């Protein structure tokens, strides 16, 4: 296909038509065939590891030269361990129950009609993402397992990596006898391709999932003519309650912030109950600084440790994706919930406390997609939820919320079986 700028519209139209055709076949594909494709793809990823690493090295080198932020470079960097994780994710998705055709509910009517509600694929799913080449495999595999065709538009900064991974995925798709257009990677970095996807590809795109920064998600939400599974920024919080164990709180805070700073589930704000500030605040701040984390805090945090920098109003809204955290002392769980409601992004929040009543209140009143008790926010991940992988963390409330796995990539229809009934 000619991918010159003047031909982007035609290119995307052809991709859309091919995807729609493939989606009809995928909707009827047996579970064994879909699983065979995913297992073969996992084998191909492992077999082609040298090619994938070489492609990724070129992408990373270009990113370093262009001054890309370290957090974004971390997201796009692949190594042997991360590539093995991609292969394992493919195998885990293959092992998941097939949602297509599953009966969600069924009942009989007094007139003898038998009604059942069953899961069906959405159709064609477009995924627009930045930096993370592993999304190429995860998103493609989840769409395939759920009987959907996928159109993947990865970021130009990781184009070579995505192409290398996509080539391995296609090996599995073709080996299993499924259509090559089941998982397509847009072969151009022209931004016009995104615009065409947002228009819906002439009715051939059923839903869009944006995976990227605030500006990308905002553009998709503003311009898309098809439904969007919004994956907003992760301004995630950890609230250390007055009845929190200090050692547990320290371990959770360090993991939530620093395990991987560039993931959307990384904690960006630490809230400490004034009831335990005298005993917990200074040790928590010191532990973060000892691990190389910059701390920006309110007056109480600054008094607890002179190394704390003053926090501005903007800090409470910021997704740093870096070794930086904002710290504030709050007046109990009610104040913590209010802070999260004002400054959070409805992504993931955690409470550390030994008080079950307080925990239950936090879990009930915090209006985020994922809320945890005594666990790190970095568990905000489809794989950790047993979904095999995720296509994103949906922070909206329409159709899907939280990790978007195979079930969330389906809709449903009603099957009505009768014996000649007519309506009076």
From Swiss-Prot:
It is found in: Cytoplasm. The gene is proA. Keywords: Amino-acid biosynthesis, Cytoplasm, NADP, Oxidoreductase, Proline biosynthesis. It comes from Parvibaculum lavamentivorans (strain DS-1 / DSM 13023 / NCIMB 13966). Pfam families: Aldedh. Gene3D superfamilies: Aldehyde Dehydrogenase, Chain A, domain 1, Aldehyde Dehydrogenase, Chain A, domain 2. SUPFAM superfamilies: ALDH-like (SSF53720). The keyword Isomerase does not apply. Disulfide bonds: none annotated. This is Gamma-glutamyl phosphate reductase. CDD domains: ALDH_F18-19_ProA-GPR. GO terms for molecular function: glutamate-5-semialdehyde dehydrogenase activity; NADP binding. The lineage of its organism: Bacteria, Pseudomonadati, Pseudomonadota, Alphaproteobacteria, Hyphomicrobiales.
């Amino acid at each position: 296909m000619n991918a010159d700028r003047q031909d982007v519209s035609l290119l995307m139209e052809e991709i859309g038509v091919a995807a729609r055709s493939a989606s009809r076949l995928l909707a009827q594909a047996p579970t064994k065939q879909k699983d065979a494709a995913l297992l073969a793809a996992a084998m191909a990823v492992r077999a082609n590891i040298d090619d994938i690493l070489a492609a990724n090295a070129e992408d990373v080198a270009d990113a370093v030269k262009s001054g890309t932020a370290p957090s974004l470079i971390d997201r796009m960097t692949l190594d042997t361990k991360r590539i093995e994780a991609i292969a394992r994710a493919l195998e885990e998705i293959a092992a998941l129950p097939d949602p297509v055709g599953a009966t969600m509910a069924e009942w009989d009517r007094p007139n003898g009609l038998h009604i059942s509600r069953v899961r069906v694929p959405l159709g064609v799913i477009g995924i627009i993402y930045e930096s993370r080449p592993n999304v190429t495999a995860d998103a493609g595999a989840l769409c395939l397992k759920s009987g959907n065709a996928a159109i993947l538009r990865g970021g130009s900064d990781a184009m070579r990596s995505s192409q290398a991974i996509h080539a391995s995925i296609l090996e599995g798709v073709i080996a299993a006898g499924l259509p090559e257009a089941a998982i397509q990677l847009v072969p151009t970095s022209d931004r016009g391709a995104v615009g065409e996807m947002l228009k819906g590809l002439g009715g051939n795109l059923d839903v869009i999932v944006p995976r990227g920064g605030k500006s990308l998600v905002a553009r998709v939400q503003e311009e898309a003519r098809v439904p969007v599974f919004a994956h907003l920024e992760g301004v995630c919080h950890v609230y250390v309650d007055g009845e929190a164990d200090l050692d547990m709180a320290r371990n959770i805070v360090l993991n939530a912030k620093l395990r991987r700073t560039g993931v959307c589930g990384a904690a960006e704000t630490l809230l400490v109950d004034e009831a335990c500030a005298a005993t917990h605040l200074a040790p928590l701040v010191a532990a973060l600084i000892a691990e190389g984390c910059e701390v920006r805090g309110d007056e109480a945090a600054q008094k607890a440790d002179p190394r704390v920098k003053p926090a501005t109003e903007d800090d409470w809204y910021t997704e740093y994706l870096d070794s930086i955290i904002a710290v504030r002392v709050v007046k109990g769980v009610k104040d913590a919930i209010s802070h999260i409601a004002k400054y959070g992004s409805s992504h993931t929040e955690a409470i550390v406390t030994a008080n079950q009543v307080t925990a239950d209140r936090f879990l009930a009143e915090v209006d985020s997609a994922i809320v945890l008790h005594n666990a790190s926010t970095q568990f905000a991940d489809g794989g950790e939820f047993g979904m095999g992988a995720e296509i994103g963390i949906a922070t909206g409330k329409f159709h899907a919320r939280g990790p978007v796995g195979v079930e969330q990539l389906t809709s449903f229809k009603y099957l009505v079986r009768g014996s000649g009934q007519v309506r009076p």
